[in-house]
C-alpha cells in the first residue's frame, strides 16, 4: 500500500517482482464485489439480532461509547486468542497491530479519525487461523471486507470480525498536517490524543484531548470534539474523506462482518452518562459470541438502533469544498487558517453556545 497524492493508502503492485499471476486482482474486494449499494437500507437489518450494550466498569469511560469492542477483545485474550485493532504508534500515526497482550487493549480504545495502515495484519491473521488460534479483527467496513477476501478459503471458524459503524476515513496526510500545525502552535511534540474523551462531561459532550511534550512539561489541550475542535468537526462535515467513502459499497451486510458495532446516539437510563453501544449480530457466530460477553446487553429493535445510525447503510455526501481543501493542504507550508477557512458558520454558533453552557440544553429541547 502506498499513499496517493491526497495521502490515502492505495494498493500498489511492485512491477519489478510481479509475475502477472493475477492473484491480487482476484482477492481485491473492490474489483470483485457483488454488492449493490442501491439495495442498502434500514431494512437490511430487519432479520439481524440487535442489542444495546455497555460495560458496567470503569473501562467504559475509556471507550468511545459502551465498550463493546473492548469487552469482546478482552474475552478473546482471556481464552488464549489474539486480537487485531487500531492504535496510535509512537509517531501518532494510526496503525493496525495484532497482539495477545491485554495492555494493548487500552491503546485500541476510542476513535481514531484517520485511515489506519493495515501493514501485514491480514497475513498475520491468516497465519494465526491456520495454527488454530482464536482471532478477533476490528476495522472499518472496507478493511473487514478486505480481510475476508484476503483469507479466501482459509478456515475462518475461529475468527470473529467486528466492523465499526463508519462515517468515512479521513486522509493520513490531513491528520499529519493538522498535527504539525498544532505542534507548531503549542511549541511541543504531540504524544497523546483521544478524539472521544469522556472524562469531563461524559458521552453527550466528548472532548478531543491533546497532550504535548513542551520541553519536558506536559501541556493538555481539550476542545469539545464535534463542537469546538476544527479537525474533528471538519471530519464530521465530510471535508476530507476518501473518494470511495462517498459511495461506499461495504455498508450494511456488504462487508462480511460477524458483528457491526458503534455508537447509540441517544440515551437510556441504565447507561448513565458514559455511553452505550449499538450492536448488530450479522451472523449466527457473531450472535453466539455476543451472548458470552460480560456487561449489560439488552435485546433491542433494529429500527431503534439503526434510525439513529444512518451510516449503517448510507454514505456521506461529498463536501463541495473538498477539492479546494486538498489543493491547499498539499502545499509544503500550511497554517491553521488552511483548516479554519473551511469551517461553516454553524461551527462558530455551536462553539459559542457550548462556551455559554447552552449547547446541550438546546439540543435536548430540539430532541
Model-found features: residue ranges?
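Cysteine-centered iron-sulfur cluster-binding motifs in ferredoxin-type domains/subunits
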Residues: 12-31, 64-67, 142, 241-248
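A short alpha->loop->secondary-structure connector
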Residues: 104-105, 152-164
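Low-complexity, highly charged intrinsically disordered N-terminal segments
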Residues: 64, 69-91
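Short, flexible loop segments at boundaries between secondary-structure elements
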Residues: 158-181
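Glycine-rich phosphate-binding "P-loop"
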Residues: 93-123
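Iron-sulfur cluster-binding cysteine motifs and their immediate structural context
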Residues: 1-12, 23-41, 258-259
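Ferredoxin-like iron-sulfur electron-transfer modules
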Residues: 1-20, 191, 225-236
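Long, compositionally biased charged/polar accessory segments in the mid-to-C-terminal portions
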Residues: 79-82, 188-367
Amino acid at each position: 500500500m502506498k499513499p496517493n497524492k491526497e495521502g490515502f493508502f492505495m494498493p500498489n503492485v511492485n512491477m519489478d517482482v510481479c509475475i502477472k499471476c493475477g492473484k491480487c486482482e482476484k482477492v481485491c474486494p473492490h474489483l470483485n464485489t457483488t454488492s449493490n449499494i442501491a439495495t442498502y437500507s434500514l431494512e437490511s437489518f430487519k432479520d439481524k439480532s440487535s442489542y444495546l450494550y455497555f460495560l458496567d466498569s470503569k473501562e467504559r469511560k475509556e471507550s468511545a461509547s459502551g465498550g463493546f469492542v473492548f469487552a469482546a477483545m478482552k474475552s478473546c485474550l482471556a481464552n488464549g486468542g489474539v486480537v487485531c485493532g487500531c492504535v496510535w504508534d509512537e509517531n501518532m500515526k494510526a496503525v493496525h497491530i495484532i497482539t495477545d497482550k491485554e495492555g494493548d487493549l487500552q491503546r485500541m480504545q476510542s476513535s481514531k479519525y484517520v485511515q489506519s495502515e493495515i501493514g501485514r495484519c491480514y497475513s498475520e491473521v491468516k497465519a494465526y487461523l491456520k495454527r488454530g488460534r482464536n482471532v478477533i479483527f476490528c476495522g472499518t467496513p472496507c478493511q473487514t471486507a478486505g480481510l475476508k477476501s484476503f483469507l479466501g478459503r482459509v478456515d475462518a471458524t475461529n475468527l470473529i470480525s467486528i466492523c465499526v459503524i463508519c462515517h468515512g476515513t479521513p486522509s493520513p496526510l490531513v491528520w499529519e498536517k493538522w498535527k504539525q500545525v498544532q505542534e507548531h502552535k503549542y511549541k511541543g511534540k504531540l504524544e497523546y490524543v483521544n478524539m472521544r474523551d469522556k472524562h469531563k462531561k461524559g458521552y453527550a459532550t466528548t472532548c478531543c484531548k491533546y497532550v504535548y511534550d513542551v520541553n519536558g512539561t506536559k501541556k493538555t489541550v481539550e476542545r469539545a470534539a464535534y463542537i469546538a475542535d476544527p479537525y474533528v468537526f471538519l471530519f464530521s462535515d465530510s471535508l476530507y474523506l476518501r473518494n470511495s467513502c462517498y459511495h461506499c459499497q461495504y455498508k450494511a451486510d456488504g462487508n462480511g462482518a460477524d458483528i457491526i458495532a458503534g455508537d447509540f446516539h441517544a440515551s437510556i437510563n441504565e447507561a448513565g452518562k458514559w455511553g452505550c453501544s449499538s450492536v448488530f449480530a450479522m451472523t449466527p457466530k457473531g450472535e453466539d459470541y455476543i451472548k458470552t460477553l460480560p456487561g449489560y446487553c439488552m435485546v433491542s429493535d433494529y429500527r431503534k438502533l439503526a434510525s439513529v445510525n444512518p451510516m449503517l447503510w448510507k454514505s456521506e455526501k461529498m463536501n463541495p469544498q473538498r477539492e479546494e481543501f486538498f489543493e491547499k493542504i498539499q502545499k509544503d507550508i500550511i497554517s491553521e487558517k488552511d483548516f479554519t477557512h473551511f469551517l461553516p458558520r454553524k461551527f462558530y454558533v455551536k462553539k459559542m453556545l457550548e462556551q455559554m453552557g447552552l449547547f446541550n440544553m438546546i439540543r435536548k429541547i430540539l430532541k
